[in-house]
Swiss-Prot record:
Belongs to the LysR transcriptional regulatory family. GO terms for molecular function: DNA binding; DNA-binding transcription factor activity. Positive regulator essential for the expression of allD operon. Binds to the allD promoter. Residues 2-59 form the HTH lysR-type domain. It comes from the Bacteria. The keyword Cell membrane does not apply. The keyword Secreted does not apply. Gene3D superfamilies: 3.40.190.290, Winged helix-like DNA-binding domain superfamily/Winged helix DNA-binding domain. This is HTH-type transcriptional activator AllS.
Length: 320
């Protein structure tokens, strides 16, 4: 009923509004075009066109068919290439989860551009998660690969890991915060008087981690690192921030870095993927990271000894 030639004929008639013009476009006779449309209407049991002596126009059913027919035809035309890709061991879909600390729109776009050029028929799905939420996606939600799982050892022996680096932290507050000019290491009693600004762990199944908060201390949860830094600048609270994201603000005396009794150790992050069942696209992504290719450099900038500057409204953080 919906063979490629019939779909092309229907689309041409709908677009030209004429059997004769569709015949010219398809290098067929008008009688052939008219017969195909008549047969299609008989097989579907509905009228697809209103006919006048000079033109034809779509019925409601015809409009609905047109909205679907182009997608069907494109799918049929691409199917041979898709089948060859699957036969060559290329995944039909690859789900990639990225740690919030490593996430960058530009980094994702760079990797997507590289992947899309090589695997045009693979569906790529990116997700942004926080702390143990990255492992959660890999363990329980069908994700193929994770950029920035916590630690350097897998949570299950079915995964492979490649250490990417360690995030260095600074304990921060605004320059006009009451604790900013206290001499010497701050005590827990002093710290507890002010809210801890944190980003909530996005784990759904695994146990959530709390970045830093003292017993009895008020906690304020924000959705991302940009908001967290903005809250520090506004004097709302205190807490740890990755050094590359705050060093310029420290140098400008907009933020103050202090020492507290228990400093946060560096956080090692790794690339993680399934040992078994992966295809060529995942293999190529792993190679990009293990070989530290430029296509993935944007994900690793937080590990470098670089400084970042704040753009307006704290919307983006540009590595210089």
């Amino acid at each position: 009923m919906f063979d490629p030639e019939t779909l092309r004929t229907f689309i041409s008639v709908a677009e030209t509004g004429s059997f004769s013009k569709a015949a010219e476009r398809l290098c067929k006779t008008t009688a052939t075009i008219s017969y195909r449309i008549k047969l299609l209407e008989e097989n579907t049991g509905v009228g697809l066109f209103f006919r006048t002596t000079r033109s034809v126009s779509l019925t409601a059913a015809g409009s609905h068919l047109l909205s679907q027919a182009k997608d069907w035809l494109a799918w049929l035309d691409s199917m041979p290439d898709e089948l060859r890709q699957v036969n060559d061991g290329v995944e039909r879909q690859v789900n990639i989860v990225v740690n919030n600390l490593l996430y960058s729109p530009q980094a994702v776009a760079s990797l997507l551009s590289w992947l899309n050029a090589r695997y045009p028929f693979t569906q790529f799905h990116f997700s942004r998660q926080i702390y143990m939420g990255v492992w959660d996606s890999l363990l329980y939600e069908g994700f193929s690969l994770a950029i920035g799982v916590t630690g350097t050892e897998p949570l299950a022996n079915t995964f492979m890991l490649d250490p990417l680096g360690s995030v260095q932290w600074r304990f921060l507050m605004s320059a006009d915060h009451p604790l900013a000019h206290v001499s010497g290491p701050l005590t827990e009693a002093q710290l507890r008087r002010f809210p801890a600004i944190n980003i909530e762990d996005s784990a759904r199944t695994l146990t959530k981690r709390v970045a830093w908060r003292l017993p009895g201390q008020k906690e304020i949860i924000v959705p991302d690192m940009e908001t967290k830094i903005a809250a520090h600048l506004a004097g709302v609270g205190i807490g740890f921030v990755p050094q590359p994201l705050c060093q310029t603000l420290i140098d400008k005396n907009e933020l103050v870095s202090c020492t507290i009794p228990t400093m946060r150790p560096p956080s090692p992050l790794s690339l993680a993927w399934h040992k078994f069942g992966g295809g060529k696209a995942v293999e190529d992504i792993v190679k990009l990271f293990t070989q530290r290719q430029p296509e993935i450099a944007g994900f690793l900038s937080i590990f470098n000894t670089v400084r970042c500057e704040k753009s307006s409204h704290f919307a983006n953080w540009r590595v210089k």
